[in-house]
Structure formats: C-alpha cells, structure tokens
Swiss-Prot record:
Organism per entry: Idiomarina loihiensis (strain ATCC BAA-735 / DSM 15497 / L2-TR)
Primary residence: cytoplasm
One GO biological process term: tRNA modification
Keywords: Cytoplasm, NADP, Oxidoreductase, Queuosine biosynthesis
Lineage of producing organism: Bacteria, Pseudomonadati, Pseudomonadota, Gammaproteobacteria, Alteromonadales
Catalytic residue positions: 183 (thioimide intermediate), 190 (proton donor)
Function: Catalyzes the NADPH-dependent reduction of 7-cyano-7-deazaguanine (preQ0) to 7-aminomethyl-7-deazaguanine (preQ1).
Coiled coil location: none
Gene label: queF
Pathway(s) where this gene product acts: tRNA modification; tRNA-queuosine biosynthesis
Enzyme class per UniProt: oxidoreductase
Gene3D superfamilies named among the record's database cross-references: 3.30.1130.10
EC number(s) given by UniProt: 1.7.1.13
Positions with a binding annotation for substrate: 84-86, 222-223
Name this protein carries in UniProt: NADPH-dependent 7-cyano-7-deazaguanine reductase
Pfam families: QueF (PF14489), QueF_N (PF14819)
Amino acid sequence: MPKKDALDHLSLGQHTDYPNEYDPKQLQPVPRSLNREPIGLKDKLPFSGVDLWTGYEISWLNANGLPQVAVGYFAVPAESPNLIESKSFKLYLNSFNDSRFDTWEYVQQLMETDLSACAGTPVKVKLKQLSELEGESVATFPGHCIDDQNISISHYDYQPSLLATEQHETEEALHSHLLKSNCLITNQPDWGSVYIHYQGPKLDRAALLAYLVSFRRHNEFHEQCVERIYQDLKALGMKKLTVYARYTRRGGLDINPFRSDFEPALQMQRMARQ
C-alpha cells in the first residue's frame, strides 16, 4: 500500500470531534514499515529500543464522580509493528475525562490493554499521582553539548552527506538541543534534544551539528527521525551506537524515542523544555 493511502485514514490534520466517553477506537496505528523500508530497515532490526511517551493531561472520574488526575508514562517497544499516532493517542486519553472507573489500577490496566492492541505488542503503562512527582529535578543529557560552535549553517533540508568523521576512533557521548523537524501530516514543528553515544570513527562535531540542523525542514514522525539518524550514523562505521531524542510536548504528550545496539534506555526525568 502506498504511504499516502496508508496515512489517509488518520485523524491528524483533520477536524475531529472530541469524545465524551471512554473510546478505545480513537487509537490509530501507523505501520512502522512505511518509513523503515526506505532507510534500509528490514524485519530484523539492527537495534533495540522503546518509544517513551509522557502524558500530562490525564483525568477520569472515580466511582463517586470525583475527578482524578495523573501523569502517565508509556513504553512502546521499537519492535512493535505499529507506532501510535499522536493525535489519536490524545483523543483516546481525553475519552477518559467524563467516564467513571473504580480504581487507578483498573485505568492503568485498561490503558495497557488498549495501547498494546494498537501497537501490536505489549505496552507498559505507569500512572503517577502528582504528589509522587513534586520536587522532581529537570534532567539533561550526559556528555558534551555540541551547540556552542562558531560555524556557518546554510542547509536546512535533510542532507546526510554533511556528516564527516576523523581518522581515529573514540567512544564519546554528545548531545544537541537544536533538533527541529516537522510533522509528516500537518507540517507543525517538532522541537527536540538528541543524545548520541557511540564507539567508532570520531565524529566531526561541526559536521554533526550541521547535519542535525538539516532536519529543520524535514517532514517525518519523531520515531522515524530518530531511526533515520541512527541509520545515517551507523553507515559511518560505528561499532556501538545509541540515538535518543526527547521532544517537547504537544497536546499534553511528549514522545521520546530511544534506539541502541548496546545499552538499555536511559532512565531520566523530563528536560527543561518538556
């Protein structure tokens, strides 16, 4: 099926009525294969990973009709056949607003069941009360920030040929807060920070920054941008590689895709812009 036809059914970019009662049918899957095949990703993935979502606008009614509020943490495995389209995720969460449920545990279990069905593989959900999060510090990525460089930038359309390496090998962790791409459907800007931990040919930092900035006019979902960056860097001969992006929230949700061929996902709180 052509990519356009596969995406035509999505509520993203279309006028949508907000549901007033719990409705799992709001969730819409997007096959990951649509954007994996063009960048050389087959069924056997060269990485493991997870899409870590945070939901800040979650509410429902308890058995007595009293509103409950929570922050939700959702982990969608990168191995799932589908990613979850973000607007449909928002509409799904909003469908809880005026529906009654007996316990927090039941709501969490219900979300796990529905999201797992959409993704095509088990999804983990954790709902936290606000009291559990008060006083949490704002996190930052480890390693060296490459943003403060006195360089000229002229490419704002995706250009992997900008990447360059030096002759010797190293292991290092780098990050940038200058990642910006655009929604595949609506063209709305997606702002993010990206972390790169690698062992292999030393990356030219000026070239890496120019490459990341070249996503500025690129249209792709968050998860797909991270996998594209992973593939481009892996093609340089990296022996070990992690790419992890944390995006600013939209519609009460942020998306934080993690991909690595050698380490588990970093455990960290939200960043300054989240």
